[in-house]
């Protein structure tokens, strides 16, 4: 049985990790940490977990975490993760990091969007944890940077078109809508009920921190440096992301060419479902690790319209983290993740 721990288990992604690990046949949760809730039982903070987990939150001590667990999920804020992860690795634990600290190939890119990086040498070995693109590298990794929620949806939507050279990658535009849980469990005016309910707004236009992740991975697929226009929006629902990606196709590309590219690219993808007849909705992936993708070619404008939906807490965070754990530890990729989505 694989021993696992969660550093920073009190947020929504921490809850989702516990919920999913509870049904995992080969992993046992041994330790959870939280400075704020230290000494409290998890099921007091999250009553939904009564009779599922009675662990008590402990102080985040990397030496103890590495001793108690073979693999640690770090569900910590940016910068806090990099304070802990080097010690976890030294202690022999594998790490799946849900912060942005180890998602980038280049420390300068991280520092341009976040803060100075304390351990840039670890970026050389960290693997970007999107299984559809980097499955073999993940298999041999001891440190995986779990992708952000928006990048997961945008990259998966655009990857076959970019990799197949069917569109001009310099024309990529991504428009994404997210549920409020993407902002985390903390209290702020931005996610106050009266500020969100009955409203729909764009935010961080032209400056969202997920932009460089999208650009990094699509640039790798394109073989050239790309700049992507990315605009996120907040919608009044609890969970879910719908991303619409636009790209101008190469002259002569047909709808059949696009369909063939998606079928080929995702032929072995356990958690990508292609919607051939209809456009996907966030409801059909709720609570699951699926990314559902639909597409159309607008022949009038020569643009491909690509639509991807995910659950931001599952495929966009904790479900993908467990999928990465499975790959790193030699388990079937869908272990603990086989449940159908919730509906309604």
From Swiss-Prot:
CDD domains: AGPR_1_C, AGPR_1_N. Pfam families: Semialdhyde_dh, Semialdhyde_dhC_1. The active site is at residue 149. InterPro entries: AGPR_AS, AGPR_type-1, NAD(P)-bd_dom_sf, NAGSA_dehydrogenase, Semialdehyde_DH_NAD-bd. Its EC number is 1.2.1.38. Pathway: Amino-acid biosynthesis; L-arginine biosynthesis; N(2)-acetyl-L-ornithine from L-glutamate: step 3/4. Disulfide bonds: none annotated. GO terms for cellular component: cytoplasm. One of its GO terms (molecular function) is N-acetyl-gamma-glutamyl-phosphate reductase activity. Belongs to the NAGSA dehydrogenase family. Type 1 subfamily. PANTHER family: N-ACETYL-GAMMA-GLUTAMYL-PHOSPHATE REDUCTASE, CHLOROPLASTIC-RELATED, N-ACETYL-GAMMA-GLUTAMYL-PHOSPHATE REDUCTASE, CHLOROPLASTIC-RELATED-RELATED. Catalyzes the NADPH-dependent reduction of N-acetyl-5-glutamyl phosphate to yield N-acetyl-L-glutamate 5-semialdehyde. This is N-acetyl-gamma-glutamyl-phosphate reductase. It comes from Syntrophobacter fumaroxidans (strain DSM 10017 / MPOB). The gene is argC.
